[in-house]
Amino acid sequence: MVTKLEQLIAQTILQGFDAQYGRFLEVTAGAQHRFEQADWHAVQQAMKKRIHLYDSHVGLVVEQLKHITDQRCFDVNFLTRVKEIYTGLLPDYPRFEIAESFFNSVYCRLFKHRDLTPDKLFVFSSQPERRFREIPRPLARDFAPKGDLSGMLQVVLNDLPLRLPWENLPRDIGYIATALRQNFTDEQLATARFQVANELFYRNKAAWLVGKLRLADEVYPFLLPIHHNESGGLFIDTCLTSKAEASIVFGFARSYFMVYAPLPAAMVEWLREILPGKSTAELYMAIGCQKHGKTESYREYLTFVHQSSEQFIIAPGVKGMVMLVFTLPSFDRVFKVIKDQFAPQKEVSQTRVLECYQLVKEHDRVGRMADTQEYENFVIDKHRISAELLTELQREVPEKLEDLGDQIIIKHLYMERRMTPLNLYIEQANDQQLKDAIEEYGNAIKQLAAANIFPGDMLFKNFGVTRHGRVVFYDYDEICYMTEVNFRDIPPPRYPEDEMASEPWYSVSPNDVFPEEFRHFLCTDLKVRHFFEEMHSDLFHASYWRGLQQRIKDGHVEDVFAYRRKQRFSQRVIS
């Protein structure tokens, strides 16, 4: 029998989610103003604020429920009825899928991530799969060239909500039209239909027009990043029309977009067509619904495990001194557990490692740091764990294991996108691949540094290569802000004997870094040394790093491009 208390609990949770998502939309709606004001520090603050909203509102609801129930414990039947009532509130609810995740979060906070069974929380959704395949209201407007591509582009750009003047709109329209004609024939463009999202996608210092270019036999992305010039005028920086380029723009190593999406499921469905390689989890994360993205990641994991018979194995690559990393051979993610004891040379605590991972979650990842999802009390069937991995788990993380007989519980782990470790990639690379990898590695270091992130441990084993060939950092236990580091030149030796001594002839403080030393541990291979010296020798000079520090201290926020600089209209010759 359903009681008023059960109904009150269900309604309180849904009202709490309503409040959270209302604040989420409120912060998101401010993105246009922040962009128009070129208030880049406010952009960074809003990003962190929006990430914190979810956990904050979960905490508020948990306190409400403790007050309502007088902190009583309830039996299984009571909890099942609460979920049934909550499920009954969702069929006509516009954000049902995230409301389910919010319910899960409240349950987990109340019951310490214990007893996570489908009868008590939404392990899988209660609603029809992809309910918004037919979108209830238009998310985009349609445009057709009708023999005048430039005229159509002018209508599209003049229709944008931005209130700033264009630097040179006819020039940009010419650039876009030329770029389109370089990728598509006149016959294709003559019958093309363009769909442009009603809302702009804001991230970093850009506002992205996101659209689709529909041809008779295929749909392509149509992406235009809009930037400021120094005088406050707007300009289009490039035109991207390949699905590979779109995948990088919406990549897992980038900050979440701010896009006004009162119907997030509908937005995800609309994006799916131009991002076919992205999972549902990745699409939700891309639009800022990272907690529901975590739910979808777990569901994707459960589906994979159910459909395969693979065993969990130790992840390929050099074993970490702080993290134990394992995976499934065909799964596109890895699982990372903080070891109970670290290698002696690692002067870091477990608390500090947790702080580092949270820092990455909240910071601008500039396309160079992999996003992670954090789980507690992660259950794995023991027969799915290889003997080697089980031994490793029992040796390295016994304090984080709970043995249930046929299953084990890992009390805390991170799930992260799987990549090819850079050191393994380099070992197998041909000369061109090696050159590209070193160029990417150096660019990753420089872009992280410009965003006020110093990786700490810069060895190749701490970086991965994505399927698009991008180099991404993924080992965060020594990460810190650039402004916390003291970059020093190595003093000249006092005597010839100094260079032969086992100890340095100069004092070294905890935050001291000597970039000259990077050459010794990064360039042991002669080919690597050659490419490094050719493209990134500035990384070996303390003056380079101090210059970046000064720009950060001066309040400068660097541009972040989700495409190669040579693709910028200002960098390439439009023929």
UniProtKB/Swiss-Prot annotation:
Q: Which terms in the GO cellular component ontology are assigned? A: cytoplasm
Q: Which Pfam families match?
A: AceK_kinase (PF06315), AceK_regulatory (PF20423)
Name a GO molecular-function annotation. Answer: ATP binding
* GO terms under biological process: glucose metabolic process; glyoxylate cycle; tricarboxylic acid cycle
* Catalytic activity line of the entry: L-seryl-[isocitrate dehydrogenase] + ATP = O-phospho-L-seryl-[isocitrate dehydrogenase] + ADP + H(+)
Which residues make up the binding site for ATP?
A: 315-321, 336
The positions flagged as active site in the entry are: 371
Cited function: Bifunctional enzyme which can phosphorylate or dephosphorylate isocitrate dehydrogenase (IDH) on a specific serine residue. This is a regulatory mechanism which enables bacteria to bypass the Krebs cycle via the glyoxylate shunt in response to the source of carbon. When bacteria are grown on glucose, IDH is fully active and unphosphorylated, but when grown on acetate or ethanol, the activity of IDH declines drastically concomitant with its phosphorylation.
HAMAP family recorded: AceK
| Protein name in UniProt | Isocitrate dehydrogenase kinase/phosphatase
Source lineage: Bacteria, Pseudomonadati, Pseudomonadota, Gammaproteobacteria, Enterobacterales
* Gene name of the record: aceK
